[in-house]
Amino acid sequence: MEKFTTHTGVGVPLRRSNVDTDQIIPAVYLKRVTRTGFEDALFAAWRGNETFVLNQPAYTHGSVLVAGPDFGTGSSREHAVWALKDYGFRVVIASRFADIFRGNSGKQGLLAAQVAQDDVELIWKVLENSPGTEVTVDLAAKQVTVADIVAPFQIDDYTRWRLLEGLDDIGLTLQHADEITAFEATREPWRPLTLPAKHLPAVPITAARPVA
């Protein structure tokens, strides 16, 4: 996972509250078996409306989404984070996030920056009055800068550390690679191993239902 320190990109104002994961990416797209290529699914139900913000030329290449409160509610699906990242978003700013969405975001390298609603309102006004305005997000300083607005944001220390270090779950595990290798080299032979089956079961297996 790429380290996140600061990011500057075009801000996209999404004046909608309670945006749930099914609105972020409809369930029909979850049938895909790949982990990438979900950019076309992002906000699919809304993008058919030509007035939707992502259909406006000034915002099509945005990378900082500024949303309403309670973003990411609904069912837990990593695909919501994947769709946002595949489209090009690095940061989502909102005054409140669903806990599971916030957790999934941190694990996938998407920064969920919690900003006071009064500051979100000010940022929206700037982005709507001056489409294409860039937003700078400084994770080290926990600060968002838009034009003359400087707003602090909240993020838990553990997620902030993971993003700064660029550590997803696999990266965290690989930090202990030497310890894992040493353990495997000295583990007792009687401990169970996960190996492919090398023989048929000693007892015949009877199908629960007749096989045609």
Swiss-Prot record:
One of its GO terms (biological process) is L-leucine biosynthetic process. Pfam families: Aconitase_C. Its EC number is 4.2.1.33. Pathway: Amino-acid biosynthesis; L-leucine biosynthesis; L-leucine from 3-methyl-2-oxobutanoate: step 2/4. GO terms for molecular function: 3-isopropylmalate dehydratase activity. It is an enzyme of class 4 (lyase). GO terms for cellular component: 3-isopropylmalate dehydratase complex. Gene3D superfamilies: Aconitase, domain 4 (3.20.19.10). InterPro entries: 3-IsopropMal_deHydase_ssu, Aconitase/3IPM_dehydase_swvl, AconitaseA/IPMdHydase_ssu_swvl, IPMI_Swivel, LeuD. It catalyses: (2R,3S)-3-isopropylmalate = (2S)-2-isopropylmalate. Keywords: Amino-acid biosynthesis, Branched-chain amino acid biosynthesis, Leucine biosynthesis, Lyase. The keyword Amino-acid biosynthesis applies. Catalyzes the isomerization between 2-isopropylmalate and 3-isopropylmalate, via the formation of 2-isopropylmaleate. Heterodimer of LeuC and LeuD. Belongs to the LeuD family. LeuD type 1 subfamily. This is 3-isopropylmalate dehydratase small subunit.
